[in-house]
Amino acid sequence: GDAVALWRRFGFKSHVHFMVNLRGADPASDIADDRRLVTDPAFLPDEGKRYPGCLVESARLTDCYEAGQWRPYTEEELVGVLVADVLATPPWTRISRMIRDISATDILAGNKKTNLRQVVEAAVDATDEAVAEIRSREISVEGATVGDLSLQTIAYQTATTEERFLEWITPENKISGFCRLSLPTALPRDTANESSPPPI
C-alpha cells in the first residue's frame, strides 16, 4: 500500500499486475486477494493486469511442480477466478490484459490459450450479471450520438486521495470517454511541513 500511496501523491496513474495461481495460493485465496485489491483504500488501482501463473522450463517453480508442491489450476478453476475478478472490479478500473506473451511451446504447465480473455468474457456474459469494469463497457467501434451521452461522476476515497471518476456514457451504460481527477488529502511530511516552495 505504501508504494501506491506514494505514486498517488504525485499524480501518477496506478497500474497493478496481479498474478493468480502462485505457489501457496488456491482459487479461494486468489479471489479474496483480488477483493482486497479492489476494495481496500490502500490500493484501488486505476488499471490492472491479471496474469495466470504458468510454468516455463527455466523457472525455479519447476522443482515445486515435480515435487507436487504446486499445480496449475484447471481451466474451470482459472476461468472461475477471473470471472469473479471481473465481476468485482469497480467502474473506475480497467483490466487491460489477462495473459502474458509467452509462447505455448515454452509453457510446461498452465494456461496455453491465447484467447483466454474471450473465454472469460463469454463466461461472464453467461452469468447475466452487470459488469462495471471499464474495458467491458468501452464503446469501441460502436457509434454514439453526442446528445445521447450523459456525464456521470463517481466519487471514492483512497488512503491518501479524494478521487473523482468522470465518465461520459450512453443510455446503455457504454463509456464514450472518461477523465480521472485526484486531490491529495495528505502530503509527504517533508513536503507539507519542511520544504519551502522554489522561487519563481
Q: Each predicted region: which residue ranges?
A:
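A short, polar/charged loop-to-alpha-helix boundary motif
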Residues: 187-193
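Short, flexible, glycine/charge-rich loop motifs used to bind or transfer phosphoryl groups or to couple energy/partner
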Residues: 38, 156, 191
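Conserved C-terminal portion of the radical SAM core fold
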Residues: 2-60, 76-102
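C-terminal accessory regions of radical SAM enzymes
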Residues: 69-182, 186
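Acyl-donor binding region in acyl/amide transferases
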Residues: 1, 194-200
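Short glycine/proline- and charge-enriched loop/turn segments
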Residues: 62-69
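Aromatic/acidic cage segments in peptide-binding pockets
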Residues: 56, 183, 196-197
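Broad gene-expression machinery/nucleic-acid interaction feature
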Residues: 47, 163, 199
